[in-house]
């Protein structure tokens, strides 16, 4: 039985993950953790997620170390915001708890802190900006295509619901990185985030990145390879959060096979790296 703790337990992703964990025969939900000061503290998480009483009360992230010591999870799943996730990862690695992290928006400095914590502690970790199986096949297709279409102009367009807090999405950033790495470019040097005014002629190396926000869009990602006389579009559309949650469940099951002290991603989980 895999003992699972979830931070961001009452968020869109967190509550969906909890509902799914409660359905899995080889998993046990042992902790549901929310932001400090949450008014839901002490409430049974099953009641919040529509499952009735499950015997797991919502706890406050300010007491995370105590919660981990009391509940002894095998893995902690984090879908929060970057600043909170860094502190969660610090505490979890100190406690020797493995990690599945889908939080996005980390700065380079924050990501280095995360790497240092995982390497120093030797815990197992899967960290991915998007855990949907289809998106990770999408990344593989981009990796394979980019060198073949290296003389084509590349534009990345992502669209999400109005409530999404970071832009561009972690998935769009990862697509940028995949294409840049596959074509010998440095993502930070070639990315152009939106365009306005007299921008002049497009350079051959630049990669445009554009974010759309509106309505209840779960997540659309389009990579456009534009050449002379033709264009190729690689598209992934998420119809519901079930796509992401299914990937999280696979990552939880994979974690014991992950390499200690090294960040692995969904490509490793799916065996396509």
Curated annotation (Swiss-Prot):
Function according to Swiss-Prot or TrEMBL = Catalyzes the conversion of 4-hydroxy-tetrahydrodipicolinate (HTPA) to tetrahydrodipicolinate.
- Give the Enzyme Commission number: 1.17.1.8
**SUPFAM superfamilies named in the record:** Glyceraldehyde-3-phosphate dehydrogenase-like, C-terminal domain, NAD(P)-binding Rossmann-fold domains
One protein family per Pfam: DapB_C
State the family it belongs to. Belongs to the DapB family.
What's the name of the protein? 4-hydroxy-tetrahydrodipicolinate reductase
User: Gene encoding this polypeptide?
Assistant: dapB
- Tell me where it mainly resides: cytoplasm
Please state the pathway this protein functions in, per its UniProt record: Amino-acid biosynthesis; L-lysine biosynthesis via DAP pathway; (S)-tetrahydrodipicolinate from L-aspartate: step 4/4
Q: Does the keyword RNA-binding apply?
A: no
Reaction(s) catalysed by this chain's protein: (S)-2,3,4,5-tetrahydrodipicolinate + NAD(+) + H2O = (2S,4S)-4-hydroxy-2,3,4,5-tetrahydrodipicolinate + NADH + H(+); (S)-2,3,4,5-tetrahydrodipicolinate + NADP(+) + H2O = (2S,4S)-4-hydroxy-2,3,4,5-tetrahydrodipicolinate + NADPH + H(+)
InterPro entries, sorted:
DapB_C (IPR022663), DapB_N (IPR000846), DapB_N_CS (IPR022664), DHDPR_bac (IPR023940), NAD(P)-bd_dom_sf (IPR036291)
State the Gene3D superfamilies in the record: Dihydrodipicolinate Reductase, domain 2 (3.30.360.10), NAD(P)-binding Rossmann-like Domain (3.40.50.720)
Domain of life of the organism encoding this protein: Archaea
Which species does this protein come from?
Methanothermobacter thermautotrophicus (strain ATCC 29096 / DSM 1053 / JCM 10044 / NBRC 100330 / Delta H) (Methanobacterium thermoautotrophicum)
Q: Which residues bind (S)-2,3,4,5-tetrahydrodipicolinate?
A: 161, 170-171
Subcellular localization: Cytoplasm
């Amino acid at each position: 039985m895999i003992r699972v703790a979830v931070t961001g337990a009452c968020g869109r992703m967190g509550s969906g993950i909890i509902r799914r964990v409660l359905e899995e025969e080889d998993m046990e939900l042992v902790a549901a953790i929310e932001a400090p000061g949450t008014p839901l503290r002490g409430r049974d998480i099953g009641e919040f997620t529509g499952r009735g009483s499950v015997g797991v009360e919502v706890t406050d992230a300010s007491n995370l170390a105590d919660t981990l010591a009391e509940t002894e999870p095998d893995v902690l799943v984090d879908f929060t915001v970057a600043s909170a996730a860094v502190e969660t990862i610090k505490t979890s690695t100190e406690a020797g708890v493995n990690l599945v992290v889908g939080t996005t928006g980390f700065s380079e400095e924050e990501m280095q802190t995360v790497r240092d914590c995982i390497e120093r502690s030797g815990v197992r970790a899967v960290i991915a900006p998007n855990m949907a199986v289809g998106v990770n096949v999408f990344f593989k297709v981009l990796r394979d295509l980019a060198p073949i279409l290296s003389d084509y102009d590349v534009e990345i367009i992502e669209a999400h619901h109005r409530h999404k807090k970071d832009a561009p999405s972690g998935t769009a950033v990862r697509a940028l990185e995949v294409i840049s790495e596959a074509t010998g470019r440095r993502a930070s040097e070639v990315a152009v985030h939106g365009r306005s005014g007299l921008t002049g002629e497009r350079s051959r190396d630049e990669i445009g990145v554009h974010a759309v926000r509106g309505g209840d869009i779960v997540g659309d990602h389009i990579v456009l390879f534009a050449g002379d006389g033709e264009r190729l579009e690689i598209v992934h559309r998420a119809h519901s959060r079930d796509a992401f949650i299914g990937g999280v469940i696979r990552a939880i099951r994979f974690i014991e096979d992950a390499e200690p002290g090294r960040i692995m991603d969904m490509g490793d989980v799916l065996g396509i790296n």
